[in-house]
Curated annotation (Swiss-Prot):
Pathway recorded for this protein: Amino-acid degradation; L-threonine degradation via oxydo-reductase pathway; glycine from L-threonine: step 1/2
Upper lineage: Bacteria, Pseudomonadati, Pseudomonadota, Betaproteobacteria, Burkholderiales
Segments crossing the lipid bilayer: none
Task of the protein: Catalyzes the NAD(+)-dependent oxidation of L-threonine to 2-amino-3-ketobutyrate.
Cofactor(s), by name: Zn(2+)
Native source organism of the sequence: Paraburkholderia phymatum (strain DSM 17167 / CIP 108236 / LMG 21445 / STM815)
Name recorded for this polypeptide: L-threonine 3-dehydrogenase
NAD among keywords: yes
GN (gene name): tdh
Record note on cofactor: Binds 2 Zn(2+) ions per subunit.
């Protein structure tokens, strides 16, 4: 079958032919129709330090997808041939304490689709049936293909009550931009997002941001004054992994504020801990998606009017994958979709 793979320990990916995967007793085989390019795939493309330490070679990658079930193992229940599905990319052990307590997103033995095992940038993908998630007919293939990052945004944004709150989001990547729409959808008052990328800040405005701030030209203090915010932000969502962004967030938080961290900063990042201690801030690390509460919330929000369509900015046939990755690398895109049906 056709697949987009890392064949060499060097930058780039290669469109190649690989063996079609086999289906185990508890697995489903999905014929892929759409995939999306993730920031993780960009790390793999660039072959940076993280990728060199993490990604087996050779292996086809990718973990944002939608498709149709074409084969099932004999033990699979609850699915039918022809079901349209996406899937949870974190395959968990089912036996550790967190898994047995229903906290599978915290499994210490997680294996990532397209990271630690063969991925979705291929004509067919096999995953455990437990990880598959049915997509309602009213949700498009393009939207279903981004349920993985949409889930990251949902898990992060809904970690705290947002109704009537002032929310600061640092980092206007696709996940941060989707978090803007989620926060507004569930009732946040002011939603402010910061970055230095004007293209993506404009996308955030289209998604409902109260203010989209280029911090190279404008300060948060000035924005807060314009919005008549005298005490600070109630909730912070750190999506960038940039130390200076986290520092500015800490300074802008109200006493008793709550912060969810999804962005991954450098290992030895220093912060002013007095901001955390004296303000009584609550900080929560976020990893992946809650299985499968986050997925149900994603569907419910889309069915109740959440509009993510502005984030879907570019579409390419898979044969044009180099153009697709170049578009993502340019920084002037939202989510980039690869079509496996043409």
């Amino acid at each position: 079958m056709k697949a987009l793979a890392k064949l060499e320990r060097a930058p780039g990916l290669t469109l190649t032919r690989v063996k079609k995967p086999e289906v185990g007793h508890n697995d489903v085989m999905i014929r892929i129709t759409r995939t999306a390019i993730c920031g993780t795939d960009i790390h793999i493309w660039k072959w940076d330090d993280w990728a060199q330490k993490t990604i087996p070679v050779p292996m086809h990658v990718g973990h944002e997808y939608v498709g149709e079930i074409v084969e099932m193992g004999q033990e699979v229940r609850g699915f039918s041939i022809g079901d349209r599905v996406s899937g949870e990319g974190h395959i968990t052990c089912g036996f550790c304490r967190n898994c047995r307590a229903g906290r599978r997103h915290l499994c210490r033995n997680t294996v990532g689709v397209g990271v630690n095992r063969e991925g979705a940038f291929a004509e067919y993908l096999v995953i455990p049936a437990f990880n598959a998630f049915k997509i309602p007919p009213e949700i498009s293939d393009d939207l279903a293909a981004i349920f993985d990052p949409f889930g990251n945004a949902t898990h992060t944004a809904l970690s705290f009550n947002l109704v009537g709150e002032d929310v600061l989001i640092t980092g206007a990547g696709p996940i941060g931009i989707m978090a803007v729409a989620i926060a507004k959808h569930v009732g946040a008052r002011n939603v402010v997002i910061t970055d230095v990328n004007d293209y993506r800040l404009e996308l955030a405005r289209k998604m409902g941001a109260t203010r989209a701030v280029n911090v190279s030209r404008e300060t948060l203090r000035d924005v807060m004054r314009d919005l008549h915010m005298t005490e600070g932000f109630d909730v912070g969502l750190e999506m960038s992994g940039v130390p200076s962004a986290f520092t500015s967030m800490l300074e802008a938080m109200n006493h008793g504020g709550k912060i969810a961290l999804l962005g991954i900063p450098p290992a030895q990042t220093a912060i002013d801990w007095t901001q955390v201690i004296f303000k009584g801030l609550e900080i929560k690390g976020i990893y992946g998606r809650e299985m499968f509460e986050t997925w149900y919330k994603m569907v419910a929000m889309l069915q109740s009017g959440l509009d993510l369509s502005p984030i879907l900015t570019h579409r390419f046939a898979v044969d044009d994958y180099e153009k697709a990755f170049a578009t993502m690398l340019s920084g002037e895109s939202g989510k980039v979709i690869l079509d496996w049906t043409v």
